[in-house]
Amino acid sequence: MFHITVLAVGRLKEKYLTEGAAEYLKRLSAYAKISVVEVEDGSLPENPAAAGGEKVKEKEGERLLGRLRPGTFLIALDVRGKMHSSEEMAEILNRLALSGRSDITFAIGGALGLSEKVLERAAMRLSFSRMTFPHQLVRLILLEQLYRWFKIARGEPYHY
C-alpha cells in the first residue's frame, strides 16, 4: 500500500477548501495511507519580487525539507514542472509501486512557490497547468487527482 504525504506550506483557511480536502482524504483512505503535513508560511514582504521574497521562500523550503521522511520519493508541484495527463500519472504511480517506491511525498510551496533547494531535492517536478493557482487550491486539486489516479489504476468508474 502506498504511503502518501502531502507536504504543504500554510493551512487551509476557506471552508470550501477544508471540506473538499476532507472529502478526498476520506475517499483516498481506501487506496493509500495518506497524511497532510503543514509547515508555517512566512510573512510576505510588501514587494515579494525583492530579495525579501526569496528569503521567505528559502525559510519555507527549509521547513519543508525538515519534514521529509528519509527515502521518500519527492514530487514537487511547480508551475515549471512537466505536465502529465491523469492517465499518465496513474501509470507513473504504478511504475513507482512496481519498483518498490511506495513512499511518496508531494510538496506544495507557499504563495511564492518552492525554494530551489526543494526543487533540487525533488525526483520529479509536476505541473497541473501553465496557469498559476493559489497554493491552497492546489492542495484540493492534488487530492482530487490522487483519487482519480487510483481509480484509473484500478479500472474503477470515476474517470471518463
From Swiss-Prot:
GO molecular function annotation:
rRNA (pseudouridine-N3-)-methyltransferase activity
Q: Does the keyword Methyltransferase apply?
A: yes
NCBIfam families referenced in this protein's UniProt entry, alphabetically: PRK00103.1-3, tRNA_RlmH_YbeA
Q: Which UniProt keywords apply?
A: Cytoplasm, Methyltransferase, rRNA processing, S-adenosyl-L-methionine, Transferase
InterPro entries membership: Alpha/beta_knot_MTases, RlmH-like, tRNA_m1G_MTases_N
Q: Please report the name of this protein according to its UniProt entry.
A: Ribosomal RNA large subunit methyltransferase H
Organism of provenance:
Pelotomaculum thermopropionicum (strain DSM 13744 / JCM 10971 / SI)
- Name the protein family: Belongs to the RNA methyltransferase RlmH family.
